[in-house]
């Protein structure tokens, strides 16, 4: 057992803090910007850790516009569209490396694509193509929602 009892809370808060600090930096301070790479790494702290650690507290509400997830972002989603299932699919996509960064204009990353598969099957059960800004909003809102439950 760890002597660090508030790991989950601190990890989520610190991950949110990392994003806030990065957003406040000027491009000149950063040299090359890797904000999307940083954000995808931060998804571990904003989505994966909360989903894994306090799974029973993940909302089972229907996924709706209040979460900034539009229907046209979702290409495949088998079963009921709940926040709990949506987050589980994103967690699986990240954990199993089924994630792609894509561009609409070939000069910058504009979207993140996630796929999730049922074990042993070749066809995805979930596919999402979401604009980076919408994913950031969702991840922050999800992390803050989960913090309120800890």
Which residues make up each language-model segment?
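Short, contiguous, well-structured surface segments enriched in hydrophobic/aromatic residues
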Residues: 28-81, 141, 145
């Amino acid at each position: 057992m760890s002597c660090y009892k508030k790991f989950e809370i601190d990890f989520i808060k610190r991950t949110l803090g990392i994003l806030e600090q990065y957003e406040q930096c000027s491009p000149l301070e950063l040299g090359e910007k890797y904000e999307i790479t940083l954000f995808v790494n931060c998804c571990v702290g904003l989505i994966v850790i909360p989903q894994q650690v306090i799974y029973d507290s993940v909302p089972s509400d229907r996924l709706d516009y209040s979460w900034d997830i539009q229907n046209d972002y979702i290409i495949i989603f088998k079963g009921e569209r709940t926040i709990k299932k949506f987050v589980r699919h994103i967690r699986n996509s990240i954990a199993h490396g089924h994630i792609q960064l894509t561009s609409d204009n070939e000069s910058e990353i504009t979207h993140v694509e996630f796929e999730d598969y049922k074990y042993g099957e070749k066809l995805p059960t979930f596919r999402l193509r979401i604009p980076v800004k919408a994913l950031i909003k969702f991840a922050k809102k999800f992390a803050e929602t989960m913090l309120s439950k800890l």
